[in-house]
Each structure stands twice: as C-alpha cells, then as structure tokens.
C-alpha cells in the first residue's frame, strides 16, 4: 500500500464534500530552487536531508491550508447527506440528497470544471494543485466531489540549464521562452447559441409514462401503485444556466414532498425536497395558484446535453420516510407550441363512482393552448396524452376532441382527428381552429372544458378545464417618473400574477403620493406612444397601497400581459402620468417566491444627481437554509455598488446595528445568494428588524434603503441547542471581558455599557447599564441644613428639595401659573451639568456611582451664583475608642462608631485631635482656627480640594483602594512628600516572636501585642526570599 502511495505521489483525504488528494511533495511554491533536482548527483546527495525536511514542512502547510478551507465544506456536506426519503417534518433534515456542484471553501464549482486551489492568505493560489469537480455514483445517485492532484510532475522538462519560475505559473520555463508550459485548464465555455435554442420544455407524468420506475432495480426505490389515477404536468424554462420548473398536479392528492431529475438509466442527477407544512407551503404564490415552483440552479454542462437530447426524466414523490405513497415520472421534451402558450390544461380520467375504469389506468394528458384575438381570432391546440385507445387500435385511431361550456353544455369546438401510430406512453396531436372573442373571454376565465376521447370507445375519456398556463411567473415593475425634468419625489412598485380562474391579482405600493392630489391608478396598454387605459385600480388604493384583483379579464389584456405591453400608471389632477412602469415577466423561484417585495427608497441626504432613484428587492430563505435575493434598480447611474443587510433587534433609539456585505455589483439588476449563513443570523431575518441598503462603493454613500418584511425561515433552519444552557440576554461570566457591543434596553431605547440615565417611567430613578443588564435605584436626597436666610423648597419636577432664599420661596409659592417671563425661563434653565445629568442652580445631590449606587458619603452642590460644582466628602468625628473596637453600623455607613460602653474620655486616650501624627477613621476633626487662605499662606498644602497645614502628616486615600496606611505623606513648606513605611530587621524579628505558644499563657484581659500590618507584610515577603535563597545558591554551586 505504501508503494502505491509513493508511486502516485498523492495521499487521498476523504471529506463529506469530496476526496481531496494531498501532494506528497511541495509543488505550490515552485520558485524555491531548493526543491528542484539539481543536475549534479553530488550536490543532490548533499541537499537530500534539507529537501526531506523542507518536504515534510510543506506537507504540513498544505494539509493545514486545505483543512481550513474545506472545514465549511465538511459541515455543509454532512447537512446534505444523501437521503431517499424525507425525515420527520418537525426535525432538522437534509434537504439536498443529490449534490450536482462542488463547494470549495465558499465558492461553488460546476460539475466538470477545473481550477487551481486557492487556500487564501497566507498561502494564496497554489498553481501546482489542480482541482476538479467530478461526478461520483453513490447508491444510484450522482454526487459531486472535489479531487485535487499534483501537476508538477506533468510539467515538460526544461530545455535549458537554469530555468526560472514565473508568477502565476507552476512549471519552470527558460528565459525568453514564450511557449506556455503549464497544463491547460479544461474550463467549460457555454455555447450561447445552444442555450438560446434550448429554452422551453414540458413533461407529462402519468402511470404509463412511469414505465422505467417499474424495473427490477427500481422497485425497491419507488412505489408506482396509483389507484386514483393521479396525473401531473410540468413546464420548464432554461434561462442563464438555470432550469426553472412549474407543476400542475391532480387535486386528488396533496402536495408532493420531493422532485427528482433522473437519466434514462434511472440514476438520480438532482433531487429537491419541497417545502411543506401542516397548512401547506409557505409560498403565497403557490398557495394561491396551486402550482409547484422551483429552480435547478447551475445545471452542469453534461446534464445540459442530456436535457437537449430528450434523455432527462422528472419524478414526483409523495409520502414520507416511513411510507412511500406514490412516484410519478415523465420525460422532459421540447414542444414548439410552448413559446406562444397562453393557456394550459391537465387532462384526467373521470371518477364517476370514485373508481377509475381499469382500461384508463395510467391515462392522462396535458394541453398547450395558444390564441390570437386580432381581427380574425384563432386558437392553436397541442395535445400530449395517452391511454384513450382500445387494445386493437394500433394504427389510424380516431379521436374526438371537444371544447365545451360545461355550465350550458354548449360545444364550442369539436373535431375528429386521427392518430397514425398510437403509443402507450406519449402521443402528440396539434389542432387549429378559429374561435370567437366571446369564447376566448370564457377561456380566459377558466369556464371551458377540454375532453379527449376515443371515437370507437367513448368511455375511454380524459378531460380537464382550460386555465392559465402552468408556468410559475409573476409580472413586476418599478414606478418612477419618465421625465428627467420632473421634480416629484414619488416612486413605487407593482407586481401582479394570474390565478387559475383567470383573475389578475395585483399589489401596488407607492411612496410620496399625496392623497390630496386624488391619485388615479390604472392598468394601461403601451403600444409605442399609444397608451390605452384598460382597468381602473383606484378604488382599492388606501394608505399608499392598492391590493386587489381584476375578476373579469379579457383575452386582449391577457395577451398584452404576456407580450410585455401591460403597465401601471399613477396619475393626479395635475399630471396625467406622475409615475409609471411596464410589467416584466419573471419566473417564480427562490427570492421571488417570498410573500412580497420591498421598496428601496431614496434617502433624503442622497446626492441630488439621483433624484428619481428607486429599487425593488425580493428576499427569501430556501429549503436548504440559503439566503436568496434579487434587486432591480431604476434611476441609479452606472457605478460600482454594494448590497448590505442591516439588522437590529428592535426599532429603538441606540439599538445595536450589525451590517453584512452580501455582494458587490454594477448595473440595474442583481440576483444572488449567500451560502452557509449561520442559523443564528438566519433567525434574525424573521425575529429582528432588518433593512436592505444599496451603497456606492467609491463614495460610500447610502443610495437606497428599504425595510424588510418578516422573512419566513423554515423550521429546520432554526438554531438547535444541544443542552439546557440556552443563552439568555444579560447572562455573563465575571471571568470574561465585557463585549463592547453590549447594550441595555430600557424604556423603549438602548443604552451603551456603563451609561447612566434617568428612567423615563419614573424621573426620580437613576439607571445604569452594567454587563447588558439595566439596574435602577430611587434617587436618595441628602439631608440639608439651610441657613437662617434660606428656606427648604422642592420645586415641581425636582426629586429633592433645595435651600433657596426665603423671598424666592415666597414668590414661588404665590405663583399660580408656570413662568412665562423670559427672565423667569432663563432663571429656570440655569444650573450645572455633571456628566449627562442637569442639576438646577442651588441643588444638592449624592453622586450616582454604579454598581454601588448612590454615594451617600459625598454631597455635591451647584453654586447658585458661580454654577460651580463642589463634591466634598463627609468629615467623620474623632473616635472615642480604639480603632480596632470601632465598627460601621452598615456596609454603606460613612463613619465608624464606638460600641456602647467602650467610649473613653479624650484625656485618658492616647489619640487626641490635637495630635497630627495619629490618623483616625477617614479624617480627623481639626479645629478650624485658621481659614484655608491663611493655612496656604503659612506654607500649607492643597491636595484634591483638601488643605493641610505646614508640617501635617496623613495617609493618602485612593478612590479605588481606600486609605493607604503603609504610605505617609507630609506637608513641608507648601510641598508634599510621600514615603512608604520601611521595616528594619529588628522590627521583623520582634514581630515573629509573638508565637501561638506564648499567647496561651497570656491573660485574657491583657492587651493584645501590637502588630504592625505594614511591617508584617514586608517581613513575610523577606522570609520567603530568604527561604528561596539557599536553593538558588545550591543550584549555582552545582
């Protein structure tokens, strides 16, 4: 086995998304000359050990790079593990059992494509690693896998002695050699002419067309038992490498759970799990029309060939994992009439007694109807059917084709064509006939019934109503002024679709359309310069929206809609066309399958060069948990643009905002997707407030912005928690740093971390944000002692009283109405601002210091004259007992007190207020014999708004650590010097002599020996140092 690996020079590493061969030799940095074999054998032997070590190091770097890039692919691959049947509808499940494209990092690669491995920084593009997306069969499925190999050994030998390595090349070349020696990459180039010719396809799915599902190898995978004779028809549109599909199914059965695309051999090429809930699909359009819509994105080149050669089959699956109910299949084929199709019909065998005639088992059909309502109106009918022939009718079989008004039993069309060679699977029959405008009107409203039966055996009959065509499509437009000189700010959007009964459902949204101008909204037909009004939609206009339906739609309107000649016009009393737009058809899938689009509005501060800029955006999340979006712009000049998704938890002041760049683009149209978006971000699209923004890439200016409606997220895309530790906003771990984005939500707005504010619910409460949680506390008013000339007064709107002159208090009490005088208003606005809080002149308050709350030991005041803020701290009285006996009555008490019965007189106590060298609790009460000016004039010192006399000593107080008793400061001739207390060796020896053995013999009433806390700490540190010293000396001597 080892020999085989050495011969192949590759080690295969299997992942969920592919088998990635890792090279056994370094090939990516070919410019390193040390890795190349030298011409001389002697030099080669000398460099062999170096090459071996460099090769091993290169292996590790390549493996690490591929692991990083493919890590996301591994996770995605596990999500898309192949499953034949759907799991429980309520749990997470894989929604793409067959994967027809490779995901390398976050880049999708087409099946059959090749590329150089890009490992990102710091490795970059590895030009000697060639990767390929290959098809690997796995349990009758084709699964795409990535395979990479070393192509350095495939380089041709250089024709010179000193070849060089060029940037972006793997193989070395000779200087001046213009021939490219690199291995050419096989990049499939699409043939535009080929794709233009393969656009419209259709399929009929009945029991008879599902013949290949009944083979011996397929019986274990599919159930074809169909007692109700369920049939279905499909339409396909191939557009820009994507295959859009639409299905009409029988009303006798519910919505299928999956769609498969298989080849002639029954190998599954692609499988899509359909979105189903208890109430049906989440799609508004599919619920309204009863259709099944979707798209197969990026069809590989090999599969396009299968589609072009009519070798592709489609399979509908019903049931679940426990029970497979039914599987219907049909061949996807081209039909010329599909290009002009206006109506469709699904033909089924009748069930008179709830049972199908055994001779009609597996019978069904579909009709492709094209009409023209000109001067000579006509109808073209293409029938695709089976099962209406007798056993002996094997040639030239006669049929009866009827179109009738079932309500009146009035036959409108009746012909008897003949089929030369009847087939048990597919028969195609084309008929044409003139038809009246009245009958076309009945056809457009779904009133006509089409019947195909055998002329010889009339009981062999299939029938169905003619309805709007089976294709899933909507028609949309942007509403904007058509004149560049227009000064209006009005804009809007419109989108419509056809129901099966022929009614036209419309949705119109406008912006800056004033109802006072009596707007008139109408459907118009635009043919050149002529504009004809067809329908008036004004009665349904309300609050900038017009939502409704046009029940009786004429054939002319229907033809104009499909031809792209129908538009929406908004007029006013002064302008016949304020804003308008022409409806354009779009297939329904992915982003356009959401509930409704959003209007991207021009911002007020936007540059005046884009006065009529407007946009429309669709956004949805598919069944594979990928985000899809589509943006259409109008009035935006050609430039490089950026599409951003903005998210905030709720619409509130100060809410945290996150922005994600979805894509950079240019032009007026963008259709894209975002793969592997985390579940936590997907759920925000449904639960949070989201905006879609279009920015200019160069100027960084916001051009358009629109608010997303609630985007529905499939249940299996929600985040899954594996334990009970569900994260709760506000939970925190003290060992972790506070996130800078942490905010608190209170009273309808957000506040930043450590921010303080007054509660909007109670203005006498102060709140603060700490670790994502808001805490509020009632304002504590300081105890005030007013002067004899002042009076305690509490004004309206203030939480605490303040001392004001008696005259001002009397005037305030006599005043019955609020101040209207300018002088009074100015006087009310006078005050001080501390932080973000305003305090009126003369007010006093305790500072709010979270998380401890109000500091009641400090009282701040706003000077009524100078508006200066002073915050002196409370001066504690001297203690009348030993400091060891003193205590604080509660945790927030400012001063210590002595226990009852422990006070001692000032004469008998060692510490007296007159001794400046002894410090008491917080500050000592000194006799105010001199003013501050006199103290400073006599050589005193001022430290932090506190005055010390010349020669006075004290311990400094730090706000974060309290009083520093081991540091002593002294004021000497207006200069402050601070020193830390130093302990001698004798002091430390004296401290250690007080042992526990001596304490046993001490009397209980004896005073405890004094222990200096500062010296004890220094002595312990010194002892530890001496204990370690012999060990170090021993190591040094050894």
From Swiss-Prot:
Residues 1-53 are cytoplasmic. GO terms for biological process: amnioserosa formation; dorsal/ventral pattern formation; establishment of protein localization to extracellular region; imaginal disc-derived wing vein morphogenesis; maternal specification of dorsal/ventral axis, oocyte, soma encoded; negative regulation of BMP signaling pathway; positive regulation of BMP signaling pathway; posterior Malpighian tubule development. GO terms for molecular function: BMP binding; collagen binding; growth factor activity; protein sequestering activity. InterPro entries: Chordin, Chordin-like_regulators, CHRD, VWF_dom. It is a single-pass type II membrane protein; Single-pass type I membrane protein. This is Dorsal-ventral patterning protein Sog. GO terms for cellular component: extracellular space; Golgi membrane; plasma membrane. The gene is sog. PROSITE patterns: CHRD, VWFC_1, VWFC_2. Residues 197-337, 339-471, 474-588, 592-713 form the CHRD domain. Residues 75-1038 are extracellular. Gene3D superfamilies: 6.20.200.20. The keyword Membrane applies. Its main location: Golgi. Keywords: Cell membrane, Developmental protein, Glycoprotein, Golgi apparatus, Growth factor, Growth regulation, Lipoprotein, Membrane, Palmitate, Repeat, Secreted, Signal-anchor, Transmembrane, Transmembrane helix. Palmitoylated, probably by Hip14. Changing residue 27 to S: No change in baseline secretion but eliminates increased secretion normally caused by coexpression with Hip14 and reduces intracellular levels of Sog.
């Amino acid at each position: 086995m080892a020999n085989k690996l050495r011969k192949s020079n590759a080690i295969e590493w299997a992942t969920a998304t592919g088998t990635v061969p890792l090279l056994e030799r370094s090939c990516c940095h070919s410019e390193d000359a040390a890795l190349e074999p030298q011409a001389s054998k002697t030099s080669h032997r000398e460099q062999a050990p170096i090459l071996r070590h460099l090769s091993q190091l290169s292996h590790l770097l390549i493996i690490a790079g591929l692991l990083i890039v493919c890590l996301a692919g591994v996770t995605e691959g596990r999500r898309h593990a192949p499953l034949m049947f759907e799991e429980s509808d309520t749990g997470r499940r894989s929604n793409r059992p067959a994967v027809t494209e490779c995901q390398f990092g976050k880049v999708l690669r087409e099946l059959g494509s090749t590329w150089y491995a890009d490992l990102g920084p710091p490795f970059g593009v590895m030009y000697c690693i060639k990767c390929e997306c290959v098809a690997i069969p796995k349990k009758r499925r084709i699964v795409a896998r990535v395979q990479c190999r070393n192509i350095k050994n495939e380089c041709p030998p250089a024709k010179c002695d000193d070849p060089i390595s060029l940037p972006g090349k793997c193989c070395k070349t000779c200087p001046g050699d213009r021939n490219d020696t690199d291995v050419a990459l096989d990049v499939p180039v699409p043939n535009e002419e080929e794709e233009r010719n393969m656009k419209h396809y259709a399929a009929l799915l009945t029991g008879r067309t599902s013949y290949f599902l009944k083979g011996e190898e397929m019986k274990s995978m599919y159930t074809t038992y169909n007692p109700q004779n369920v049939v279905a028809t499909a339409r396909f549109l191939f557009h820009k490498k994507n295959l859009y599909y639409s299905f009409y199914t029988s009303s006798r059965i519910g919505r299928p759970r999956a769609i498969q695309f298989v080849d002639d051999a029954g190998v599954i090429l692609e499988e899509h799990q359909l979105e189903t809930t208890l109430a049906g699909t989440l799609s508004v359009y599919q619920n309204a029309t009863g259709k099944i819509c979707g798209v197969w994105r990026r069809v590989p080149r090999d599969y396009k060939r299968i589609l072009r050669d009519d070798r592709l089959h489609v399979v509908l699956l019903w049931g679940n994992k426990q029970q497979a109910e039914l599987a219907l299949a049909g061949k996807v084929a081209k039909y010329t009439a599909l290009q002009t199709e206006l109506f469709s019909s699904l033909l089924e065998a009748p069930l008179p007694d709830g049972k199908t005639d055994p001779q009609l088992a597996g019978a069904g059909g579909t009709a492709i109807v094209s009409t023209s309502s000109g001067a000579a109106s006509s109808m073209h009918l293409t029938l695709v059917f089976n099962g209406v022939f007798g056993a002996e009718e094997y040639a030239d079989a006669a049929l009866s084709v009827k179109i009738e008004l079932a309500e009146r039993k009035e036959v409108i069309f009746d012909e008897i064509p003949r089929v030369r060679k009847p087939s048990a699977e597919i028969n195609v029959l084309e008929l044409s006939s003139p038809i009246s405008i009245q009958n076309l009107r009945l056809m457009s409203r779904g009133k006509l019934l089409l019947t195909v039966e055998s002329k010889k055996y009339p009981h062999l009959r299939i029938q169905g109503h003619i309805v709007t065509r089976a294709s899933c499509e909507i028609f949309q437009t942007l509403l904007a002024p058509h004149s560049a000189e227009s000064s209006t700010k009005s804009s809007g959007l419109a989108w419509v679709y056809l129901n099966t009964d022929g009614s036209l459902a419309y949705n119109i949204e406008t912006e800056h359309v004033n109802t006072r101008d009596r707007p008139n909204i109408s459907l118009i037909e635009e043919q050149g310069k002529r504009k004809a009004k067809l329908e008036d939609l004004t009665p349904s206009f309300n609050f900038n929206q017009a939502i409704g339906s046009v029940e009786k739609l004429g054939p002319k309107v229907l033809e104009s809609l499909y031809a792209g000649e129908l538009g929406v016009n908004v007029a006013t009393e002064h302008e016949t066309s304020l804003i308008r737009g022409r409806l354009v058809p779009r297939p329904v899938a992915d982003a356009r399958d959401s509930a409704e689009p959003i209007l991207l509005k021009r911002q007020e501060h936007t540059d005046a060069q884009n006065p009529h800029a407007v946009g429309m955006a669709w956004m949805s999340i598919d069944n594979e948990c990928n985000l899809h979006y589509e943006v259409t712009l109008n009035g935006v000049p050609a430039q490089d643009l950026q599409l951003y998704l903005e998210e905030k938890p709720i619409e509130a002041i100060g809410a945290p905002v996150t922005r994600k760049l979805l894509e950079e683009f240019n032009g007026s149209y963008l259709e894209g997707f975002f793969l592997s978006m985390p579940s936590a971000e997907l759920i925000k699209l449904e639960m949070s407030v989201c905006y879609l923004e279009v920015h200019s890439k160069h100027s960084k200016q916001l051009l358009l912005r629109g608010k997303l409606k609630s985007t529905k997220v499939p249940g299996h895309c929600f985040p899954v928690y594996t334990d009970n530790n569900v994260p709760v906003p506000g939970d925190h771990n003290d060992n972790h740093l506070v996130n800078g984005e942490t905010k608190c939500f209170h009273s309808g707005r957000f506040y930043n971390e450590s921010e303080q504010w007054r509660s909007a619910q109670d203005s006498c409460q102060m709140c603060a944000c700490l670790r994502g949680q808001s805490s509020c506390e009632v304002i504590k008013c300081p105890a005030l002692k007013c002067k004899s000339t002042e009076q305690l007064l509490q004004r309206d709107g203030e939480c605490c009283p303040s001392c004001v002159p008696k005259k001002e208090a009397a005037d305030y009490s006599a005043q019955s109405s609020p101040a209207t005088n300018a002088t009074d208003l100015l006087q009310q606005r006078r005050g001080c601002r501390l932080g973000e809080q305003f305090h009126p002149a003369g007010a006093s308050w305790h500072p709010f210091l979270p998380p401890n709350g109000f500091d009641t030991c400090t009282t701040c005041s706003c000077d009524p004259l100078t508006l200066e803020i002073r915050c002196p701290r409370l001066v504690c009285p001297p203690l009348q007992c030993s400091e060891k006996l003193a205590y604080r009555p509660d945790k927030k008490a400012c001063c210590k007190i002595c226990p009852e019965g422990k006070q001692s007189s000032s004469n008998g106590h060692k510490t007296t207020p007159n001794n400046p060298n002894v410090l008491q609790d917080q500050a000592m009460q000194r006799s105010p014999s001199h003013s501050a000016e006199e103290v400073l004039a006599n050589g005193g010192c001022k430290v932090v708004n506190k005055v010390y006399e010349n020669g006075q000593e004290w311990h400094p107080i730090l706000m974060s650590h309290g009083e520093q008793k081991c540091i002593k400061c002294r004021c000497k001739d207006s200069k402050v010097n601070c020193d830390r207390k130093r302990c001698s060796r004798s002091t430390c020896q004296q401290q250690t002599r007080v042992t526990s053995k001596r304490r046993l013999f001490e009397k209980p009433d004896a005073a405890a020996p004094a222990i200096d806390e500062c010296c004890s700490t220094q002595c312990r540190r010194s002892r530890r140092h001496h204990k370690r010293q012999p060990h170090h000396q021993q190591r040094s001597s050894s």
